[in-house]
């Protein structure tokens, strides 16, 4: 076990260096004076894009080699550090003494360690100044993150083996990068693979250990992204702790929900990129709420988040589109303003170009598309993706073909002979038309037909979405909270009109719409709509959105509390709320169990 603990620590250190420390040092002038949220979003998106672009570009020129990547990354890092004049003079002075024989190796290394210690102390002092007055809040967030990492790492430490069959495929693709071959199985978003390849090259961490532990560690980035989004859009900054606590403790009852949660244990592209879904939405909202013109920092981070999502996995980009649309629909007037529309379109185009250019060039050079990218054709043809449910839905509703039901060819011919001929059907249809025309049945008004269609669709979404995923009892509670959220949204709109004489950009409406829209996407096959994303893949973000929607009443209470003298105790109350959720889930027997691990092979 000690070996695996050491490997876990190595993966964690490599991840922190590559994802956060390297860009923080190299781009420190740009990040100087920026908020912690900006720094987090910048580092977690720009680092992925730079690594992806560098590795794939070297591969396109057939010069991808670990030694080149090693010298480029460490060379840029060291050169950036030595840009500081005082540090450069000190290091050069120490080196001159070392080579002149005036300083021994031990003394040189001791001086280097002292300098590193000084830099670390300075960093933590600055960080302490940043979080001054909010230590309890960040303490709660840190505990939740550590809890999540421990929970999602449990399976890997128990089995020391990949928990999902697809991980062996991704292992092979990363090994292809080690051999200098990009897109070894065809053109496919490879940002995650390039990231793990770089960890292997820069730190000597095996691909196996990276794939085994990176996904669980990367959960921290997902939770921080969720934290940043809901801290921005909710009225109180303390409500988000309740959302995260509920997400990490409450059990799920449907196999699709369990599958969605279990995927966070695995290092696979979609889950690696889920954090960009929330960052895209965060910076689009900030962009729409701004008063300035031009291409600002908010739009830049929206662009990098969009580009990172495309570079990691296309499903994440599709989810980001629907989540952004849920909020943007309530700010259409801001989108189509002259000062916003042009730069927003430019940012989207740049994001798409940055992320897809290596893939487009690889495809143009003759590398074929990877097979899973045919999902678009599957939708057009009405056939299933690997995890799709379209044909299963047809089977359950009586629309399946004889091939789907396994009926033999002989039985098929017997059934065919018993069916009426086409001429008989035409005759019967003509008779029915004549009867209808002779009886003069009044036509149903268009409004009523539309209303009936909407009601029928809502019932199907409830039946094949809420009920199927959460059961009758929980689905009932979700419906009640959705109604409460809608009422609170209307109340806030009325207050905004009365006080500000305008309709404000409604965040509550966006949360409620997003939770329903993702449920609609899940139930799409049952409504006769194409299954754009495999239903089980939607369950994780949907769970977060539903919990956020249910937290809207608590957010209002926190907001009102902060307007009173008792508002000083809001952090302590949020801590009590987190503890109450943990205790309550255990007391009522709804605390989550351990997630399943699919052992296709055992180490």
Kindly give the residue locations of the regions a language model identified.
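Membrane-embedded, hydrophobic transmembrane alpha-helices
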Residues: 1-131
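Alpha-helical transmembrane segments at the extracellular/periplasmic loop-to-helix junctions
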Residues: 6-22, 271-277, 433-499, 542-543, ...
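Membrane-helix boundary/interfacial segments in multi-pass membrane proteins
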Residues: 60-69, 157-167, 182, 204, ...
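Membrane-interface helix-loop-helix junctions at transmembrane boundaries of multi-pass membrane enzymes
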Residues: 126-135, 238-239, 291-296, 334-345, ...
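Active-site lumenal/periplasmic loops and adjacent helix-entry segments of GT-C-fold
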Residues: 127-275, 541, 598-602
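Membrane-interface alpha helices of multi-pass inner-membrane proteins
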Residues: 298-314
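Perimembrane helix-loop-helix junctions
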Residues: 319-353
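Signature aromatic-anchored transmembrane alpha helix within multi-pass, membrane-resident enzymes
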Residues: 344-355, 556-593
């Amino acid at each position: 076990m000690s070996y695996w603990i050491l490997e876990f620590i190595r993966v964690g250190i490599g991840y922190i260096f590559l994802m956060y420390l390297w860009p923080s040092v190299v781009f420190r002038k740009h990040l100087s004076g920026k908020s912690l949220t900006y720094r987090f979003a910048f580092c977690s998106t720009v680092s992925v894009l730079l690594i992806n672009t560098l590795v794939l570009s070297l591969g396109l020129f057939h010069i991808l080699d670990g030694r080149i990547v090693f010298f480029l990354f460490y060379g840029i890092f060291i050169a950036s550090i030595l840009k500081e004049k005082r540090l450069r003079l000190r290091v050069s002075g120490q080196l001159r003494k070392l080579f002149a024989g005036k300083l021994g190796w031990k003394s040189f290394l001791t001086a280097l360690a002292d300098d590193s210690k000084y830099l670390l102390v300075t960093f933590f002092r600055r960080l302490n100044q940043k979080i001054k007055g909010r230590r309890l809040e960040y303490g709660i967030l840190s505990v939740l993150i550590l809890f999540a990492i421990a929970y999602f790492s449990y399976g890997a430490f128990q089995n020391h083996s990949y928990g999902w069959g697809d991980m062996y495929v991704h292992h092979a693709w990363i090994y292809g990068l080690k051999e200098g071959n990009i897109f070894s199985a065809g053109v496919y978003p490879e940002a995650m693979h390039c990231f793990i390849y770089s960890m292997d090259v820069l730190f000597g961490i095996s691909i196996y250990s990276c794939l085994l532990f990176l996904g669980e560690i990367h959960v921290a980035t997902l939770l921080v992204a969720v934290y940043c989004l809901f801290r921005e859009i909710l009225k109180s900054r303390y409500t988000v702790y309740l959302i995260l606590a509920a997400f990490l403790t409450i059990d799920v009852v449907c196999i699709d929900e369990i599958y969605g949660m279990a995927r966070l244990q695995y290092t696979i592209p979609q889950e690696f990129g889920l954090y960009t879904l929330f960052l895209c939405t965060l910076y689009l909202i900030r962009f729409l709420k701004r008063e300035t013109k031009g291409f600002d920092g908010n739009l830049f981070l929206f662009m990098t988040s969009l580009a990172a999502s495309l570079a990691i996995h296309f499903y994440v980009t599709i989810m980001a589109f629907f989540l952004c649309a849920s909020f943007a629909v309530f700010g259409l007037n801001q989108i189509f303003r002259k000062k916003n529309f042009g730069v927003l379109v430019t940012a989207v185009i740049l994001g798409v170009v940055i992320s897809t250019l290596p893939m487009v060039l690889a495809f143009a050079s003759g590398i074929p598309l990877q097979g899973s990218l045919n999902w678009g054709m599957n939708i057009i043809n009405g056939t299933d993706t690997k995890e799709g449910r379209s044909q299963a839905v047809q089977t359950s509703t009586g629309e399946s073909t004889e091939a789907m039901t396994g009926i033999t060819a002989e039985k098929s011919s017997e059934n065919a002979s018993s069916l009426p001929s086409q001429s008989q059907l035409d005759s019967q249809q003509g008779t029915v038309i004549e009867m209808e025309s002779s009886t003069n049945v009044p036509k149903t008004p268009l409004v009523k037909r539309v209303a009936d269609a909407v009601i029928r669709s809502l019932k199907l979404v409830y039946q094949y979405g809420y009920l199927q995923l959460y059961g009758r009892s929980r689905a009932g509670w979700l419906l009640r909270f959705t109604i409460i959220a809608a009422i609170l949204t209307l109340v806030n709109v009325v207050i905004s009109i009365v006080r500000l004489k305008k309709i404000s950009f409604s965040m509550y409406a966006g949360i409620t719409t997003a939770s329903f829209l993702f449920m609609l996407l899940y139930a799409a096959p049952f409504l006769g709509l194409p299954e754009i994303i495999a239903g089980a893949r939607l369950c994780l973000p949907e769970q977060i959105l539903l919990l956020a929607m249910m937290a809207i009443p608590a957010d209002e209470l926190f907001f009102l509390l902060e307007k009173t003298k008792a508002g000083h105790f809001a952090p302590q109350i949020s801590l009590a709320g987190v503890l109450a959720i943990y205790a309550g889930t255990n007391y009522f027997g709804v605390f989550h169990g351990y997630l399943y691990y699919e052992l296709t092979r055992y180490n």
